[in-house]
Amino acid sequence: MINRITDNKFELVSKYKPSGDQPQAIEQLVDNIEGGEKAQILMGATGTGKTYTMSQVIAQVNKPTLVIAHNKTLAGQLYGEFKEFFPNNAVEYFVSYYDYYQPEAYVPSSDTYIEKDSSVNDEIDKLRHSATSALLERNDVIVVASVSCIYGLGSPKEYSDSVVSLRPGLEISRDKLLNDLVDIQFERNDIDFQRGKFRVRGDVVEIFPASRDEHAFRVEFFGDEIDRIREVEALTGRVLGEVDHLAIFPATHFVTNEDHMEVAIAKIQAELEEQLAIFEKEGKLLEAQRLKQRTEYDIEMLREMGYTNGVENYSRHMDGRSEGEPPYTLLDFFPDDFLIMIDESHMTMGQIRGMYNGDRSRKEMLVNYGFRLPSALDNRPLRREEFESHVHQIVYVSATPGDYENEQTDTVIEQIIRPTGLLDPEVEVRPTMGQIDDLLGEINARVEKNERTFITTLTKKMAEDLTDYFKEMGVKVKYMHSDIKTLERTEIIRDLRLGVFDVLVGINLLREGIDVPEVSLVAILDADKEGFLRNERGLIQTIGRAARNSEGHVIMYADTMTQSMQRAIDETARRRAIQMAYNEEHGIVPQTIKKEIRDLISVTKAALPDKEETVEIESLNKQERKDMIKKLEGQMQEAAGLLDFELAAQIRDMILEIKAMD
């Protein structure tokens, strides 16, 4: 067990001072948290600096904080921002560590068993270990996570009880330390020294913690006593300094001591016998044979190695949980009095609520056909009510909070004023009769001013037809559909910003990364057709795409005024009036956001330095593609090291697309 530091303070470092309505929002949020309010909503318009407000709140309430985003890209962006705001505190990143993941599944109609197949990202695995160890060591911790934080993880008690604590003067033999390291899943490797491994040279043991990627620790013995402990560069062996205490956390989150392992194995065997009897009674002899063979192999691995592939499927027995009891997750590593912030809560809460059912149906198939014991069903994400039971205090952050959040609390704190003075755009409704020619005139007016246009349609066919028509009319236009891959999408957005074309047509323009300050017109076709992208929230989010330009304008083409349209228009007008009054009072003139246009194509050029210009990937031979992947992987690691996770994710997607060609 380790002693957790509880008196560290968050130190916010920023050249900015709260402005606009940020000071009031920060004060209200902090007062409510300190007053014991369980749930509240920060309803912040796009571009109002919600992350900065969140940072101010974290610094002032000084609680360990979990920030949940609805995908890895957004989590990476938030992680980078919080790292800049809190350079002297522990800002951690916890997302799924799979670059590629095919879950274990069975399709009875074709008698197809799909074995679990995955590619683990070593960098993300390191960051996950860094997050859990930081939570057990100190109180000034921010963990930015995706929804994977509600999936099963090992017991925090077993994890912390398994920590190997070392200090100079400690009486412990070298061999005892080696055995202790093996017990917590470290591997001995005297040649290939990497994370989660140790090596031995006489009376010196070098240990590479699972939460580090460059620094290791050298433990020097004098007889059966630790003489000194040094931190060293893993690659060069250069000594960085001496340490007074070293806590070595397990190399895996699923760790169990020997006594608990024997109890767990006995329970697994008992469950196996019970399930085999059920299968035999039902005449399912093939299923019984399959289950017996697989489970006995896993038991043997657990007995000999303390680990097996798919060990998480036995986590109920290893944790000592009852049937149906929720698994341990990242949330259990936090102290009781912690703060949760849900970014883009209208999206994220839907994911949190929906994870359990999808996981359950897949695993039931595996159990019914003898691929897993029934206890595998308890290796799962949390149900909604189980997640709620972990909530001590929570802040939902969104421009358009969902029904769920509004049901949880009546406390809504608004943040509407943008530091740039930008206003929510003007919105007008025009009839559908002659809408295409009307829109063509609006596009041409924007082209003359070197501004861009977004057009959102409801169907793929309409988007394609519209694109073809505008091309015939001489408009430089592109259509962005759902089949376009991440990297290609990024290139399209870049070309739009550079003026390679002037109009982007799409169905869903609410994906991350589609914020283009050059867009001054957003046209919404079929605005009166109620649905996911034409409900109040969808319309407000779409309208927000024109809020980065001082000339922002939105035209809805519709023949009737739906309630969703009216509410979206009214809300936008309300915000705009507040923003205009603030600007007038403070003499602020709205300025279009100046955003750097990153040249992603240079990534390809850098990966192929012997080429004079960027080439089509399809034209490369297998060896050239292999060389490109190797160089791109280096650039991806470099981007991650610089905390530019958005670029790192884009390079990763490019690598996956190139690999898919082989």
Curated annotation (Swiss-Prot):
UniProt domain UVR: residue ranges: 626-661
Helicase ATP-binding domain residues: 31-188
Residues spanned by motif Beta-hairpin: 97-120
GO MF annotation list: ATP binding; ATP hydrolysis activity; DNA binding; excinuclease ABC activity; helicase activity
Domain Helicase C-terminal: 435-601
Binding site for ATP: 44-51
Coiled-coil residue windows: none
This protein's GO CC annotations: cytoplasm; excinuclease repair complex
InterPro entries: Helicase/UvrB_N, Helicase_ATP-bd, Helicase_C-like, P-loop_NTPase, UVR_dom, UVR_dom_sf, UvrB, UvrB_inter
SMART domains recorded: DEXDc (SM00487), HELICc (SM00490)
Subcellular locations according to the entry: Cytoplasm
Protein's UniProt keywords contain Cell membrane: no
Keyword Phosphoprotein listed: no
BP terms from Gene Ontology: nucleotide-excision repair; SOS response
Alphabetized UniProt keyword annotations: ATP-binding, Cytoplasm, DNA damage, DNA excision, DNA repair, Excision nuclease, Helicase, Hydrolase, Nucleotide-binding, SOS response
Function of the protein: The UvrABC repair system catalyzes the recognition and processing of DNA lesions. A damage recognition complex composed of 2 UvrA and 2 UvrB subunits scans DNA for abnormalities. Upon binding of the UvrA(2)B(2) complex to a putative damaged site, the DNA wraps around one UvrB monomer. DNA wrap is dependent on ATP binding by UvrB and probably causes local melting of the DNA helix, facilitating insertion of UvrB beta-hairpin between the DNA strands. Then UvrB probes one DNA strand for the presence of a lesion.
Domain free text: The beta-hairpin motif is involved in DNA binding.
Stated family: Belongs to the UvrB family.
Subunit details: Forms a heterotetramer with UvrA during the search for lesions. Interacts with UvrC in an incision complex.
Name the UniProt record assigns to this protein: UvrABC system protein B
